[in-house]
C-alpha cells in the first residue's frame, strides 16, 4: 500500500485464503499442478512490451511444472496478465491431484501477471518450483526484469 514491490514465485499463492491481503494481491489460490513438462507459453498481446516478457515473441515452448489455480485472474481490476499457457500442449493435472479434486483451468490459464493494487507493485510467475524452470535465458530474464519492475528500477 505504500508503494513497495513484491515478486512472487510458484508456490507463493498456495493456500493463502487465510491471508486476505495476499489473496487480494494474487487474485487466486492454488488448485493443483502438472509434472515438469514442456508446454506452449503465449505472451499476452497487451503485455508484449512489459520487461519481464519483452523480446520473447508471441509464443514459445518452455519446461516447468505448471500450477493450476482456483480461478483465472483475467478481468480482475488492477491485474494485467503477461503470460498464458496452452493446456492442449501438455497434461495440466498430475495423477496425485487427479485423485484429490485437482482441475485444469482450460483455455484461460494465466501463468504470469502483475497487479498494481494501491501504490504497490506485485509480480507473480508460475516459474520457480525448482531451478530447472529458472536456469534458462528466458527464466533469468523473466525474474530479473520482474525484480527491476517491482522495485521501479526500470522505466516501466
Predicted regions and their residues:
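Stable alpha-helical elements in mature extracytoplasmic
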Residues: 18, 48, 52, 139-143
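Extracellular ligand-binding/catalytic regions of CAZymes and related secreted enzymes
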Residues: 88-91, 95-112, 116-156
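Oxidoreductase and adenylate-handling cofactor-binding alpha/beta cores
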Residues: 22-27, 62, 70-79, 128, ...
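Short alpha-beta junction capping motif
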Residues: 1-19, 119, 125
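Active-site histidine-anchored catalytic micro-motif
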Residues: 7-12, 25, 34-36
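Alpha-helix capping at helix-to-loop junctions
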Residues: 2, 15, 22-31, 58-61
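Solvent-exposed loop/turn segments at secondary-structure junctions
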Residues: 6, 12-16, 47, 59, ...
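Catalytic beta-strand/loop cores that center a nucleophilic Ser/Cys/Thr
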Residues: 28, 35-118
